[in-house]
């Protein structure tokens, strides 16, 4: 697990020390000091919206980033940096999006939006995994977000949606009624 990857590995450290691989030993020891990671476990798989809500007490009243591990983004400027810059300009929830093939829209949350500038869309609507025939666009949410903390109260009152889970897209759709989203 990711938790174990960034944790100390006493067995590995001992082996490297015994074999005299001191450069590697120093690298391994430094891994756990590179970043601070806090883990909040979702006790049962009730959807992404539920997973995010589980972090409410940790996040508090701050905007936060969500970065899903099932999408890899290869961009000249890192995706998270782009989202932060957009947040700093618009001071509201920001969704990372990408165009997908029309036949793939049923695999993603899809955005209906108005193009503003420099890859920025103002969100008009969000649909979680729409039918190919009814999708409003092929602009897909790609699993990168900056979200403002108002989402927590919304998720708390969001009924389970597709697959009986609390969907983040459903919560964002409610949030969009009271706050612009890009």
Task: Pin down the residues of each PLM region.
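Glycine-rich loop at the start of a catalytic domain that most often binds anionic cofactors/ligands
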Residues: 2-10
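Catalytic-core segments of class I nucleotidyltransferases/pyrophosphorylases
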Residues: 65, 85, 115-182
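Conserved beta-loop-beta/alpha segment of the NTase-like Rossmann-fold superfamily
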Residues: 11-15, 22-113, 156
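Solvent-exposed polar/charged
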Residues: 4, 33, 57, 174-177
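Short alpha-helical
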Residues: 1, 46, 146
């Amino acid at each position: 697990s990711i938790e174990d990857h960034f944790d100390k590995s006493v067995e590995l450290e001992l082996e490297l020390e015994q074999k005299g691989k001191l450069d590697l030993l120093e690298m391994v020891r430094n891994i756990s000091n590179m970043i601070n990671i806090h883990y909040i476990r979702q006790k049962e798989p009730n959807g992404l919206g539920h997973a995010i809500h589980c972090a409410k007490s940790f996040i508090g009243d701050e905007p936060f980033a969500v970065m899903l591990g099932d999408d890899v983004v290869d961009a000249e400027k890192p995706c998270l940096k782009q989202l932060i810059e957009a947040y700093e300009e618009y001071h509201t929830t920001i969704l990372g999006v990408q165009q997908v093939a029309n036949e793939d829209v049923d695999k993603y949350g899809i955005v209906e939006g108005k193009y503003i500038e420099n890859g920025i869309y103002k969100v008009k609507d969000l649909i979680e995994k729409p039918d190919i025939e009814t999708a409003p666009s092929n602009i897909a949410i790609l699993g990168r977000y900056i979200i403002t903390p108002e989402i927590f109260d919304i998720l708390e009152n969001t009924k389970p949606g597709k697959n009986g889970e609390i969907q983040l897209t459903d919560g964002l759709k409610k949030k969009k009624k009271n706050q612009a989203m890009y």
